[in-house]
Regions:
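Structural motif
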Residues: 22-31, 86-101, 169-176, 212-219, ...
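Conserved blade-ending motifs and adjacent loop-strand segments that build the rim/top face
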Residues: 52-54, 58, 185-198, 227-250
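Surface-exposed loop and turn segments in beta-propeller and other repeat-based domains
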Residues: 45-56, 116-144
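Asp-box/BNR beta-propeller loop motif
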Residues: 33-41, 105-113, 170, 177-185, ...
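Single conserved hydrophobic/aromatic residue that forms the stacking wall/gate
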Residues: 2-13
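Loop/turn-rich, solvent-exposed surfaces of beta-rich toroidal or solenoidal domains
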Residues: 147-174, 188-225, 244
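Beta-propeller fold detector
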Residues: 41-47, 112-126, 185-190, 228-233
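Entry beta-strands of beta-propeller and related beta-repeat scaffolds
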Residues: 11-15, 72-79, 157-163, 202-207, ...
Length: 282
């Protein structure tokens, strides 16, 4: 979900990755406007460079979620991510990937904090990520990614995060939640790529994923401690993206984009994807 996030105070945060000299050096930043978009400033919030064990310095993530102040909690912007790149001695784009991380940004001072509230300053470096922000530590993989590229996060009413990502080791998906001072992990059967988390209630969430020719939804009603499959939506062609629309009309809950169509021209000047919409019976 790449759209800017507004605090309703004239402040807008836009997230993006910075592309540096090497294809596997892509740190993560917020671009912020305090005057409704007239002027912007940059803040590097996650920078894995330099990494001594490998060249996995690309930050990948999915849904970023803004939490307004309420219920005795300060406002914050929740972020979860994984790192990708190459092994030592080579540079390549997203060849391997490992680990899952979480932190949040406090808009009152633009500092980053880990789940326990430790102030990590305006930028989280490689050592701070591993020491303070790890949700899941995985070994350097022999091939592929230890966690999927799309790592999404939402928040429970107590401000603790719910993190959703692929877990290739078990050919499944995972929800990770913070509870009793530690990360708790729920692995559940689900193919496809995570595409967002919708908050339904204090501890209830709908989880979206693309799966070949369609999308699939799951629901948890206990903050990620258990999950059940809810629905499947079938499309004529395989999907590349699926976005849930906040405050949508019932029949326009999902916006979906196909992969390039088999017989379509492969040029930028010609449309070659389908766009679908769908509703969900609440």
């Amino acid at each position: 979900r790449d759209q800017p996030r507004s605090r309703g105070l004239g402040d807008v945060y836009k997230r993006q990755r910075q592309t540096n000299k090497y294809s596997d050096d892509r740190p993560y930043q917020f671009v912020k406007s305090t005057d409704g978009g007239n002027t912007w400033t940059r803040q590097m919030v996650i920078d894995p460079f330099p990494c001594v064990t490998d060249n996995m310095m690309e930050v990948y993530n999915g849904q970023v979620t803004y939490q307004p102040a309420g219920n005795g909690q300060k406002e914050r912007i929740h972020i979860a991510w994984t790192i990708c790149g190459e092994k030592l001695g080579k540079h390549a784009h997203a060849t391997y990937g490992r680990n899952v991380y979480y932190a949040y940004l406090d808009p009152s001072n633009d500092h980053m904090y880990n789940v326990e509230g430790i102030d990590l300053g305006t930028t989280i470096d490689n050592e701070e990520s591993d020491k303070y922000c790890q949700v899941l530590e995985t070994p350097i993989p022999e091939r592929g990614h230890s966690a999927g590229l799309q790592v999404s996060v939402h928040y429970r009413d107590n401000s603790y995060p719910v993190v959703h990502y692929q877990y290739p080791e078990e050919n499944a998906a995972r929800l990770s939640t913070w509870d009793a001072g530690e990360w708790k992990h729920l692995t559940f059967e689900a193919k496809g790529e995570p595409r967002g988390i919708e908050k339904l209630g204090p501890e209830s969430f709908r989880i979206y994923a693309t799966m070949g020719r369609g999308a699939i939804t799951f629901v948890t009603n206990d903050g990620g401690r258990s999950v059940k499959k809810e629905a499947e939506i079938v499309t004529p062609f395989s999907l590349s993206r699926c976005y849930w629309i906040e405050n949508a009309r019932p029949k326009l809950k999902l916006l979906m984009f196909s992969n390039p169509l088999p017989d379509a021209p492969k040029t930028l000047a010609t449309a070659n994807r389908d766009v679908y919409v769908a509703g969900i019976n609440e």
